[in-house]
Regions:
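A detector for short, charged/polar N-terminal pre-domain segments
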Residues: 1-4
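Recognition helix of helix-turn-helix/homeodomain-like DNA-binding domains
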Residues: 28-42
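Short, charged recognition helix plus adjacent turn
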Residues: 42, 61-71
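DNA major-groove recognition helix of helix-turn-helix/homeodomain DNA-binding modules
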Residues: 47-63
Length: 71
Protein backbone atom coordinates (compact mmCIF):
# COMPACT_ATOMS: atom_id res chain seq x y z
CA UNK A 1 0.00 0.00 0.00
CA UNK A 2 1.39 3.40 -0.96
CA UNK A 3 1.81 5.86 1.88
CA UNK A 4 2.45 9.60 2.00
CA UNK A 5 6.07 8.80 2.80
CA UNK A 6 6.51 6.28 0.00
CA UNK A 7 4.99 8.66 -2.55
CA UNK A 8 7.17 11.52 -1.31
CA UNK A 9 10.40 9.52 -1.59
CA UNK A 10 9.56 8.31 -5.08
CA UNK A 11 8.57 11.81 -6.25
CA UNK A 12 11.74 13.35 -4.82
CA UNK A 13 13.95 10.63 -6.29
CA UNK A 14 12.49 11.32 -9.72
CA UNK A 15 12.76 15.09 -9.23
CA UNK A 16 16.47 14.65 -8.47
CA UNK A 17 16.78 12.34 -11.51
CA UNK A 18 18.02 9.42 -9.42
CA UNK A 19 17.51 5.72 -9.98
CA UNK A 20 16.70 3.51 -7.02
CA UNK A 21 20.27 2.20 -7.19
CA UNK A 22 21.71 5.74 -7.08
CA UNK A 23 19.44 6.70 -4.18
CA UNK A 24 20.51 3.64 -2.22
CA UNK A 25 24.20 4.38 -2.85
CA UNK A 26 23.95 8.08 -1.96
CA UNK A 27 21.98 7.43 1.22
CA UNK A 28 23.99 4.41 2.35
CA UNK A 29 21.06 2.00 2.49
CA UNK A 30 20.45 -1.14 0.48
CA UNK A 31 18.54 -1.24 -2.78
CA UNK A 32 16.00 -3.57 -1.19
CA UNK A 33 15.33 -0.96 1.50
CA UNK A 34 14.68 1.76 -1.10
CA UNK A 35 12.29 -0.53 -2.95
CA UNK A 36 10.47 -1.45 0.27
CA UNK A 37 10.23 2.23 1.23
CA UNK A 38 8.80 3.25 -2.15
CA UNK A 39 6.33 0.36 -2.08
CA UNK A 40 4.97 1.48 1.29
CA UNK A 41 6.23 -1.31 3.53
CA UNK A 42 4.90 -0.56 6.98
CA UNK A 43 7.80 -1.89 9.05
CA UNK A 44 10.99 -0.01 8.24
CA UNK A 45 13.92 1.10 10.37
CA UNK A 46 13.49 4.76 11.23
CA UNK A 47 17.22 5.49 11.12
CA UNK A 48 17.41 4.20 7.54
CA UNK A 49 14.31 6.16 6.54
CA UNK A 50 16.04 9.29 7.84
CA UNK A 51 19.23 8.40 5.94
CA UNK A 52 17.18 8.53 2.73
CA UNK A 53 15.17 11.63 3.67
CA UNK A 54 18.28 13.64 4.58
CA UNK A 55 19.24 13.68 0.91
CA UNK A 56 16.14 15.82 0.39
CA UNK A 57 16.67 17.99 3.47
CA UNK A 58 14.01 16.22 5.52
CA UNK A 59 13.71 13.77 8.41
CA UNK A 60 11.00 11.92 10.28
CA UNK A 61 10.22 13.27 13.72
CA UNK A 62 7.39 13.60 16.22
CA UNK A 63 4.34 15.50 15.05
CA UNK A 64 1.51 16.48 17.35
CA UNK A 65 -1.69 14.70 16.35
CA UNK A 66 -5.03 16.45 16.25
CA UNK A 67 -7.46 14.66 18.51
CA UNK A 68 -11.09 14.38 17.46
CA UNK A 69 -13.74 15.50 19.94
CA UNK A 70 -15.58 12.57 21.47
CA UNK A 71 -19.10 13.75 21.81
Amino acid sequence: MKTVLSKYVKEMRKQYHLTQVELSEKSGVGLRFVRDLEQGKTTLRLDKVNDVLRLFGMEVGPVKMQMEDEG
